[in-house]
Amino acid sequence: LTQRYGGGTFGTVYIHRVLYALSSGTSHSAQFALAAMFKTAADGTFDFISEVKEYGRRAERLKKIFTDYGFRIVYDHDLDEPIADGFYFTIAYPGMTGGELMEELIYYGVCAISLSTTGSNQEGLLACTSFIKPHQYALLEERLKLFKENHTA
């Protein structure tokens, strides 16, 4: 956190960088709603962890599918710590820039955001776990199998 944001602790970065960026210019009612959610989480009356675990399960399954078909995970560590599975993860394919990969995957019905649009210097894509449904994993595997067959030298 110190290298990336100039702050040393999670709390400092979270309050002064993340929360400020998310809530500055936001209406009072939205800020109060967010504060209420944080309060219930802190009080233990809202188990937010169980609410977000599904994204981790999806990411774990999606990462396996992508890596089984020749992709690699771009960001798998933050400094020396492994990155947990969650809402987003990053992928790359050998010999392709993020833009090339994004364009090519569209032909296979797979969409993601190029890492270059997020300010990253790494080549690859940012994939989101939020919209995939259980019945779509097999379809994704079929599409990535075709992708690999068509992109293997």
Language model features with spans:
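Conserved core segment of the aminotransferase class I/II
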Residues: 1-53
